[in-house]
Amino acid sequence: MSSHRDGAGADRITIKIHNMKRSASRSPGPASRSSLSRNSRSMGRGYDNGSGVPGDSPERLSPERMRRRLDRSPSRYGSPHREPYMRGPPPAERPAGYKVLCVSALPPKAPDDFIEETLYREYKKFGDFSVRLAHDLDERVAYVCFRTPEDAREAKHHKPRLIIYDKMAIVEPVYKSTTRPEYRPRGHSMSPPDYERYHYSRSPMGQGVPLDHRRPPIDPYDRYGPPHMHPHAVHPRDYRPLHHDYPHPPRGPPLHRGGHPHHLHGHAPPHQYAPMRPLAPRPHAPYEKPESKKDKFPNYLHHVQPEDDPLSTRTLFAGNLEVTIADDELRRIFGKYGVVDDIDIKRPPPGTGNAFAFVRYQNLDMAHRAKIELSGQYIGKFQCKIGYGKVTPATRMWIGGLGAWTSVTQLEREFDRFGAIKKIEYQKGEPYAYIQYETVEAATAAVKEMRGFPLGGPERRLRTDFAELPGATPAAPFKSSKPPYDESALEYRRPEYDPYYEESAAYAPRGGYSPYPPRGGYRGRGGYRGRGRGMYHYHNDVHRPPHPGSLAGSSSSVPPPGGVEDEWRRPPGESYDRGARSSSREPGVERSRSRSPLKRARSPGSDSDTSTRRNDALASASTVPDVARKCSTVWTGALILKSSLFPAKFHLTDGDTDIVESLMRDEEGKHNLRITQRLRLDPPKLDDVQKRIASSSSHAIFMGLAGSTNDTNCDDASVQTRPLRNLVSYLKQKEAAGVISLLNKETEATGVLYAFPPCDFSTELLKRTCHSLTEEGLKEDHLVIVVVRGGTA
């Protein structure tokens, strides 16, 4: 090695540097070489002491020193500004997934609103996402933030290029990396003082302070949620750009409003949509905790997802507005986030406070997006507070959170339990649908109970709200070639909504074990198979022929009699269970504490010979005709379902005969009882009926058989008489019981009547007194009627 040291000086310097890197034990050379080696080690560590070394060239500077020199040189600031965020980490450091796409090369003449709407239109089919526009020094870019990496990858694969204003825009993925502390995402949910403190980093006072010393590093994806919250606790789909068309700010330091991904790099490019004044006071020291918007509006950052918020609605309340603000100004600002149906501004008398407004959007998704983006932002001179307004019930409801997994069959199956569905509007693949009910009560129950329901799985929960009634006249209904009878004049009425079933639904699961085989097809609606992608309109007066051999629990698709099945739906809360079916009741069920003479006859201390003889006679009855012969007919009349009247007669098998005269009449005093609701034969609901029987002051159980038309008296010319077997067949096919609310206006006594088709539960009720009944003997069409005093349906 000595021969090399005797060579030229330049050779000696080169050899000495390499030797020092290989071994720290080599003896130091001359002073000039030692100085050079110290500079080399300093560059290797990336240490910056704030002073340059004469003779340093850019080729010998570390990347960290290059970055800091760019920070101190405004003229060289623009080029690397967005590069780390757009390109992400080097390929070796890139993780497998990304959630953000960067769209660059945007045409300068395209307005921001046009770009946003174009991106929403192009990417809405790939999943939930938000769009943010960032204005760099030399260009404008858009960031599309998806909820999941899978959605982002699919969107990138199918849309690698976009055409905007006849110009090709470039789509690049933004990789998540935790290795670079300078990646500083900044969400709009961060407090304004952070924005102001951020701008101080560019002042002369903060130039020499490294970025990492001014603020600790945070998760690169922290902007997807509110402060102090896990980044995945809030869905990114709820965030859109935080800007309005404010006038250009005065010359001077930029006042950024936040919410754009270019905060990742420790730079604050000017923003043309800045507010007219800072959002919060400038802090006195870098570590001083300043006053934030959250102190003024404590809950403005706390945004509950609509599927979890019972107060969510498409109407927003906007408070703290200028008294002189115009309708057009509010419509322009709020219109950025969706279609605004109506704006109502309330202006107090001068000097009594600020104005406020109610803004009604077309649907809940739009309203929630606006609530997220505008709450706490400046509208005019004042900082605005956004909340939900008052719910406006209607017969038409909106369902959000849908997707390619949703079908009309599924919607009809889940929503028909709340009442008569008039129409379903859904286009395959769309994220929303509309369902129109016959009554406001049915729609109210559906909106309340189906909010947050996981229709497409645990991660796909429904959003529900009321919607405007369409102005167009519904299309003409489909007519079957062989209807059993005309139901064109069917009417549907429902009683007032009853909170009792709201409470009973709380402990009823939405799913469960079904002892019956799965029902095939479209729940008996096989005629709807094979629909295309066009808008589907579901009407309630569709006629299809009945299936004479339909049985309860059958897996065949069997339509009910006379098109009634499409018009008659479940009452609110009567069963929100999914998949469960009726099962055999266990023996020894608790019996009612009724004043029934028959019950006293079975009691040990009873001395009623008549009741005892009747009980003994029923005990030997083995068929339906036997029961009819051995029981007296205590009620004759008709059951009415829409425009169909079914003559019937009831034979008392157990309970209190006083119920007949006190409750079993209509408003005019006639024995015509109208079925308005239905109860699904699910175990939780049947248990609820059993509890009502046991806890009521009195009850009665009847066997219902076909009656004579001579015993009916109905003045409604639109009502047509049908045989009772049609109603029995319908209830069997629907696996449901008819429900009637009973009311005596004179005594204000109330009660509920249940009409059960032949099933395990109804058989068990009959066997309370008719112990010898067999399955063979119950094949004849009949109903089991249960009347419970007290309560409402």
Swiss-Prot record:
Phosphorylated by Hipk at Ser-23, Ser-25 and/or Ser-27; the precise position if phosphorylation sites is unknown. Component of the WMM complex, a N6-methyltransferase complex composed of a catalytic subcomplex, named MAC, and of an associated subcomplex, named MACOM. The MAC subcomplex is composed of Ime4/Mettl3 and Mettl14. The MACOM subcomplex is composed of fl(2)d, Flacc/Xio, Hakai, vir, and, in some cases of nito. Interacts with Sxl. Interacts with Hipk; leading to phosphorylation. GO terms for cellular component: nucleus; precatalytic spliceosome; RNA N6-methyladenosine methyltransferase complex. Widely expressed. Shows some enrichment in the central nervous system. It comes from the Eukaryota. Disruption phenotype: Female flies show stem cell tumors in the female germ line as well as female-to-male somatic transformations. Gene3D superfamilies: 2.40.290.10, 3.30.70.330. One of its GO terms (molecular function) is RNA binding. It comes from Drosophila melanogaster (Fruit fly). This is RNA-binding protein spenito. Residues 314-391, 395-469 form the RRM domain. Residues 257-268, 526-536 have a biased composition (Basic residues). InterPro entries: Nucleotide-bd_a/b_plait_sf (IPR012677), RBD_domain_sf (IPR035979), RRM_dom (IPR000504), SPOC-like_C_dom_sf (IPR016194), SPOC_C (IPR012921), SPOC_met (IPR010912). Residues 25-42 have a biased composition (Low complexity). RNA-binding protein that acts as an associated component of the WMM complex, a complex that mediates N6-methyladenosine (m6A) methylation of mRNAs. M6a modification plays a role in the efficiency of mRNA splicing and is required for sex determination. In the WMM complex, may act by binding target RNAs and recruiting the WMM complex. Required for sex determination and dosage compensation via Sxl alternative splicing: m6A methylation acts as a key regulator of Sxl pre-mRNA and promotes female-specific alternative splicing of Sxl, which determines female physiognomy. Residues 624-791 form the SPOC domain. Residues 1-93, 243-296, 507-623 are annotated as: Disordered.
